[in-house]
Amino acid sequence: DESLNITAFFMKKGAGQLVDGTVYLDTNLDESLFLTPVDTTKRVSDYMIDLRSKEVRDVKILIPEKMEVSSLPAPYQIHTAWVDFCRTYSQTGNQIVMHKECVIHHRRVPRSEIPAWNKIISDWGAACNEQVVLKEK
């Protein structure tokens, strides 16, 4: 097993909304290249995921001095023959970390199981898109 670690710092405009002193943050700032729903309308064969992989992403957010955490999304995980997904949030001091992990075990999704695959991908996307809520102190 070889690892590739990439660290990047960036700011993204529009990642949150301020409404009546409450900030709703979108922390899922990226899209997975390999995890998309499969169109089954004309498909006659099994689906092959591009590659086996383990993808780990940490998104760190600094909480502004005059704000505090109102709520963090509950942990999410699912384990299947194809993929393991895990997404957690943690807070230490004025920093929140969203930890996402995706491990692709088996690349082949049988045609008959593609609807189940699509549901797993949809649920994963919804879990990753849950918002962090901050409020004024």
Regions found by a protein language model. Give the residues of each.
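A sensor for short, sequence-defined functional sites
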Residues: D1-K137
